[in-house]
Amino acid sequence: MSNKLFPPQIKVAATYMRGGTSKGVFFRLQDLPEAAQVPGPARDALLLRVIGSPDPYAKQIDGMGGATSSTSKTVILSHSSKANHDVDYLFGQVSIDKPFVDWSGNCGNLTAAVGAFAISNGLIDAARIPRNGVCTVRIWQANIGKTIIAHVPITDGAVQETGDFELDGVTFPAAEVQIEFMNPAADDDGEGGCMFPTGNLVDVLEVPGIGRFNATMINAGIPTIFINAEDLGYTGTELQDDINSDNAALAKFETIRAHGALRMGLIKHIDEAASRQHTPKIAFVAPPKSYASSSGKTVAAEDVDLLVRALSMGKLHHAMMGTAAVAIGTAAAIPGTLVNLAAGGGEKEAVRFGHPSGTLRVGAQAVQENGEWTVIKAIMSRSARVLMEGFVRVPKP
């Protein structure tokens, strides 16, 4: 046994929450150690240690992470610095096996838990919380500079978490939380340019050594590259193991994603994609087909408008990222995109798409002015609940 003295662990107030089909560790900014209250290496080091990364075993045994992109997540919330907003929401996607936290995008699934956490942790004026009803929480999504509105159910003055709303990819029902992503498309002066960074609804994406692909590259909710499943040799009915057990396929998707990121202006050199795993996402789409979901439940072709499979952090997602669902709903609403064409074409205000765990309905209000498409908002329902609250402990730096 070593005689060396080691400092004790520190404890930080935290809440472990499920939001949509993801889980993450939530913090109030004021509860973080002083050095971690500002962006930088101290904050990243703390969050990496909380989650249990980097882990060469890719299991995150020594932390709160669950060794998947859906469960290697952190959230920092504070009173909003923006007028007409309640809370600032900052999301950090923690790499599982590498020492970095990706701050380049939002997590749409955990967005469902932001309002509930803010209400329960004193970030919302108590006078605004009804005894019974719905509390509207205006969220400033600090990663992407966008407004999100969460409608959180309240019973007896507290967040209502239990209910009968069922979400494919989540085993148990809970209370429904409606979320509005306001003006979700990228601004002209934002990173990656406007909603369609290339100016086209469909581009030909040249990927050396792999091929040429028709692609819709959109920045709404989260930057996303959509490709036809057929062009990749898939049907759109694939489940996680079909893709994630194929290292060659994963490498191909990552190469396509990197070239798409370059084409979208998100990176300046192809090598930068390796340290920007959270964005852009890559997904493939197909017309409706019947298939068995990962739970064994049959998804009938007539029950969906299209099929979508998406990768997150280098792996096929078990359901669908909430931000990617915003991109799907937005692209579906705009005639001529690959997503819209897979859903049958024409003008659409909402679609129900099939994903590996089942189906999800998402709506978007899109308008065309002077030949340019804009999206007023995208809407979907998720659920959220507290799994554990108290303190997380980490070794003192």
Curated annotation (Swiss-Prot):
For this UniProt record, the keywords arranged alphabetically read as follows: Isomerase, Oxidation
Pfam families under this entry?
PrpF
Q: What positions are modified (Cysteine sulfinic acid (-SO2H))?
A: C107
Please give the catalytic activity noted in the UniProt record.
2-methyl-trans-aconitate = 2-methyl-cis-aconitate
- Name the Gene Ontology biological process terms: propionate catabolic process, 2-methylcitrate cycle
* Pathway stated in the Swiss-Prot or TrEMBL entry: Organic acid metabolism; propanoate degradation
User: Which top-rank group of organisms is this from?
Assistant: Bacteria
Keyword flag Isomerase: yes
Does the keyword field hold Nucleotide-binding? no
InterPro entries for this protein: PrpF (IPR012709), PrpF-like (IPR007400)
- For the ligand (substrate), the binding residues are S22, S69, S70, T71, S72, K73, N109, K281, S312, H317, G322
Active site, renumbered: C107, M321
Q: Which GO terms describe its molecular function?
A: intramolecular oxidoreductase activity, transposing C=C bonds
The UniProt record lists the EC number as: 5.3.3.-
Q: What is this protein's function per UniProt?
A: Involved in the catabolism of short chain fatty acids (SCFA) via the 2-methylcitrate cycle II (propionate degradation route). PrpF catalyzes the cis-trans isomerization of 2-methyl-aconitate through a base-catalyzed proton abstraction coupled with a rotation about C2-C3 bond of 2-methyl-aconitate.
**Subunit organization:** Homodimer.
Further comment found in the protein's record: Together with AcnD, they are able to restore the growth of prpD mutant on propionate.
Recorded hits in PANTHER family, A to Z, give: ACONITATE ISOMERASE-RELATED, DUF453 DOMAIN PROTEIN (AFU_ORTHOLOGUE AFUA_6G00360)
* Membership in a protein family: Belongs to the PrpF family.
Q: What is this protein called?
A: 2-methyl-aconitate isomerase
Name its species.
Shewanella oneidensis (strain ATCC 700550 / JCM 31522 / CIP 106686 / LMG 19005 / NCIMB 14063 / MR-1)
